[in-house]
Structure formats: structure tokens, C-alpha cells
């Protein structure tokens, strides 16, 4: 068994506010038995701009994963009694052991595109140091928008019609092999408004309220036969009907409270409530609480 792993990452700043980078990862594993190779190619682009009033962060990520399927060993004698099939030799080369499938594979492809942007309202605070006046922007309120797109495809292909009908117990759609694809897509938009932590001496925490709308779409293999249809050589199709495609809309409203400044206690609490779609009535609350303090000559950190 051998595996190759090539990975490269680049990230650089054009100036104090603008950053850009990318990565690529290629993995190839040949497997221990015949028709067991696996490879994955993933690459991404990312960047950010962090200004006084406007911020944006984004990344684009794609991957393409292919896995050969051999269906397992077709003759256990090669493992249990190898001398019977190798002219008396007890040692066996695993790459010569026959498998159930010789021309089949699974392919999974995916994309994830994400961007979040924020516009901040606030004021500039001036501080004089020696003969220089330093202006520092103090954000008070911000408007937030986040967009996320996901797409995932799964395809199973078996190009051997003979192995397709002998290996699988049931064959419903055709006798010429298998080529089936399922797909999932979603796009999510979030709009929110927040009061930023520390904009004045009484603001001990940050507050945010938001609404999220998501549309999901599912695509399944096309039925080529009607229910109850029987063709010679095929397994009679069950009397069920699945939609070729299906879409659904989801809507959440939620809020956050957070405190990230200081060491004694920091926390982040997020809660959202489902208003429409399959998640209507759902309540989702996540929290992260941390504490750090000195104890004698050491530092104690607690997290929950």
C-alpha cells in the first residue's frame, strides 16, 4: 500500500487591511487490494478586507473525491487456504486476489462558497501623543450580511453489466450497468444588526439579532419504469414513488450575546428559533464560556 499526499498553502497581506490566499491538497492512495485506489483533489481561495467601517471575509472551497469499489474478495480461498489456488505457495500477493467488482467507483464532488460582510457605525476618537494626533475608530453598531452556498453530488458508476446483475441482489432500472447521481444544493442568507462590545464604559457585552433564510434542493435518480412494471431480467419495482426533485425553505430568527474582552470571564451564547419549513418550532442554543485566572504562581483556565 502506498499513499501520496501533496499540500500547499499560501497567504499574504497586500497591506494592513487586505489579505489573500489559497490552498491545494491532492491525496492518492493505491489500496491494498485490486480496484481499491482512492484520490481526492481539494482547493480553496480565501481573503479578507478589514477596514475601519467595512469588513469582508470570504472563502471558496471545492473538492473531488473518487473511490474505486471492488465489492470485496470474490474467493475467500486466497485468504483461508492460499496454497490451494497458488500451486502450493502459502504467501499471497494481495494485488492478485480477484474481487467482485472491477469497473465500479463512487465519486463525491462538493463546493462551499462563503462570504460575510459588516458595515460599522461609530465615531473617531482622537488622542494626542507628543505632537501627533492619533485617530481611532470606535464602532458602536454594525449591520451584518452573510451568504453561504453549498453543493454536493454523489455518483455511483458500475460499467460492467455482468457484475452489476450478479453482485447486487436486486436490479431495478436497467441491465446495462449503473450510473446514478444524487445532488444536494443550499443557499443561505443571514441579515443581522449588532451592538458591539465596549463602545462605552457601560457596554460589558455585545448584542446581536439576526434572521436567516435558507433554500435547500434535493435531486434523486430519475425513475425509468412505472410502478409495477416487470421486464425480463429485472427485479419488479416496489410500488412506491419518490419525487425526482424536492425543494424546501427554512427560516430562523435568533440572537447572540458575547463578551470577548478580559480574562476572568469570556462567553459567547447563540440561540435561534425555527419559524418556517422543516425546522419550525425548533430551538437551538449553543454556548461557549471560558475563565482564566491566577492561582499561586500558575494560570488556571476553565472552559465549558
Regions of interest found by a model, annotated:
Residues 1, 5-27, 46-48:
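Predominantly transmembrane beta-strands of Gram-negative outer membrane beta-barrel pores used
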Residues 1, 20-32, 264-277:
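Transmembrane beta-strand segments that form the barrel wall of outer-membrane beta-barrel proteins
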Residues 2-3, 28, 35-46, 185, ...:
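Short, glycine/acidic-rich beta->alpha junctions
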Residues 19-21, 87-92, 257-266:
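Active-site-adjacent bridging/hinge elements
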Residues 21, 56-59, 142-146:
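A structural signal for short, well-ordered beta-strand segments and their strand-loop junctions
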Residues 28, 53, 62-66, 123, ...:
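Short loop/turn segments at secondary-structure transitions that flank enzyme active sites
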Residues 32-42, 46-109, 295-304:
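Outer-membrane beta-barrel translocator/channel fold
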Residues 100-165, 169-304:
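Exposed, low-structure sequence patches enriched in small/polar residues
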Amino acid at each position: 500500500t502506498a499513499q501520496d499526499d501533496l499540500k500547499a498553502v499560501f497567504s499574504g497581506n497586500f497591506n494592513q487591511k487586505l489579505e489573500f490566499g489559497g490552498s491545494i491538497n491532492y491525496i492518492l492512495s493505491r489500496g491494498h487490494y485490486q480496484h481499491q485506489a482512492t484520490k481526492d483533489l481539494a482547493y480553496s481561495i480565501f481573503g479578507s478586507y478589514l477596514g475601519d467601517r467595512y469588513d469582508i471575509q470570504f472563502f471558496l472551497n471545492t473538492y473531488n473525491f473518487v473511490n474505486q469499489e471492488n465489492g470485496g474478495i470474490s474467493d475467500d480461498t486466497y485468504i483461508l487456504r492460499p496454497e490451494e489456488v497458488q500451486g502450493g505457495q502459502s504467501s499471497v500477493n494481495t494485488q492478485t486476489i480477484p474481487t467482485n467488482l472491477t469497473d465500479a467507483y463512487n465519486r463525491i464532488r462538493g463546493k462551499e462558497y462563503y462570504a460575510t460582510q459588516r458595515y460599522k457605525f461609530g465615531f473617531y476618537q482622537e488622542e494626542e501623543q507628543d505632537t501627533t494626533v492619533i485617530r481611532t475608530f470606535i464602532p458602536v453598531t454594525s449591520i451584518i450580511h452573510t451568504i453561504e452556498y453549498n453543493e454536493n453530488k454523489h455518483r455511483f458508476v458500475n460499467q460492467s453489466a455482468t457484475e452489476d446483475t450478479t453482485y447486487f441482489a436486486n436490479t431495478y432500472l436497467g441491465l446495462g450497468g449503473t450510473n446514478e447521481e444524487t445532488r444536494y444544493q443550499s443557499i443561505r442568507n443571514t441579515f443581522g444588526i449588532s451592538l458591539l462590545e465596549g463602545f462605552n464604559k457601560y457596554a460589558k457585552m455585545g448584542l446581536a439579532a439576526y434572521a436567516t433564510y435558507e433554500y435547500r434542493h434535493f435531486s434523486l435518480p430519475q425513475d425509468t419504469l412505472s410502478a409495477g412494471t416487470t421486464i425480463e431480467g429485472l427485479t419488479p419495482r416496489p410500488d412506491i414513488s419518490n419525487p425526482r426533485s424536492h425543494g424546501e425553505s427554512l427560516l430562523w430568527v435568533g440572537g447572540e450575546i458575547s463578551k470577548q474582552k478580559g480574562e476572568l470571564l469570556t462567553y459567547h451564547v447563540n440561540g435561534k428559533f425555527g419559524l418556517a419549513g422543516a425546522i419550525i418550532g425548533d430551538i437551538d442554543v449553543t454556548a461557549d464560556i471560558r475563565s482564566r485566572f491566577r492561582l499561586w504562581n500558575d494560570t488556571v483556565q476553565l472552559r465549558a
